[in-house]
């Protein structure tokens, strides 16, 4: 993810000078590639690339969580684990905790890369960075928390799909297809519903709120999606026949 963050940052800063006005937001998640120099130069502008990275990070983490959860089924290790730890809730919860810790480290690294490359890239493009000093740490902390919460929820959705399908390929296909295709199609036919779908909600959270969905409602809806994913995963894992 850190490598993607660096590449996206380069694209954002090098293309900003050629953008006269911000492009209209596209339906569905993502769509923050085109930004203006003025947007980058404003307070908190050093985190501009993080909004675009978030969509890629969401797909990557959904895939990683899904593979970690589904690989035990494909290898047959799940039977050994369940026999060694009959309390399935504890078993799946432990896996979730380990994946959350990994996600925290990944989002720290990604955020740091975005911040570290922002100043050199801005200087190369002649973008003024004086305003970045205004509330630097509050902007950084807020962006990191929003990004991390969204990343964890994407991971939980990937884990949910893996538990239900028992297949990493199927789980990743469904998750990525929903995020990159289905939500965009819904955005074309029913644009008012887009902000409340998983991708639109998480994108609104990372953006600090939008005109259609404020930060607090986005946070609440994001946490709701996460809670639903955890609940369904635990119930399905607890009740499903694994040993036979």
Q: Residue ranges of each PLM-predicted region?
A:
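Transmembrane helix segments
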Residues: 10-17, 165-200
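Junction motif at the cytosolic side of a transmembrane helix
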Residues: 224-244
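Transmembrane helix boundary and interhelical loop/hinge segments in multi-pass membrane proteins
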Residues: 62-89, 96
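Secretory targeting signals
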Residues: 2-64, 68, 92-164, 203-224, ...
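Short hydrophobic alpha-helical segments that form membrane-spanning helices or hydrophobic packing faces
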Residues: 1, 92, 172-176
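Short loop-to-helix capping motifs
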Residues: 1, 86-88, 166-168
């Amino acid at each position: 993810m850190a490598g993607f963050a660096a590449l996206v940052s380069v694209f954002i800063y090098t293309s900003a000078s050629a953008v006269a006005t911000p492009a209209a937001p596209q339906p569905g998640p993502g769509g923050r590639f085109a930004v203006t120099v003025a947007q980058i130069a404003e307070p908190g502008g050093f985190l501009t690339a993080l909004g675009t990275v978030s969509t890629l990070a969401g797909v990557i983490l959904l895939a990683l969580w899904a593979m970690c959860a589904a690989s035990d089924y494909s290898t047959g290790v799940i039977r050994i684990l369940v026999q060694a730890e009959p309390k399935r809730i504890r078993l799946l919860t432990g896996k979730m905790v380990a994946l959350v810790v990994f996600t925290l480290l990944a989002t720290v690294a990604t955020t740091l890369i975005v911040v570290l490359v922002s100043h050199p890239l801005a200087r190369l493009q002649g973008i003024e960075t004086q305003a970045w000093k205004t509330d630097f740490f509050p902007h950084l902390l807020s962006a990191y928390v929003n990004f991390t919460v969204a990343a964890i929820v994407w991971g939980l959705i990937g884990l949910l799909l893996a538990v239900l399908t028992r297949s990493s390929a199927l789980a990743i296909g469904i998750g990525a297809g929903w995020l990159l295709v289905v939500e965009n199609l819904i955005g074309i036919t029913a644009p008012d519903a887009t902000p409340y779908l998983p991708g639109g909600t998480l994108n609104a959270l990372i953006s600090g709120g939008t005109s259609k969905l404020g930060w607090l409602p986005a946070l609440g809806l994001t946490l709701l999606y996460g809670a639903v994913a955890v609940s369904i995963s635990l119930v399905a894992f607890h009740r499903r026949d694994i040993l036979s």
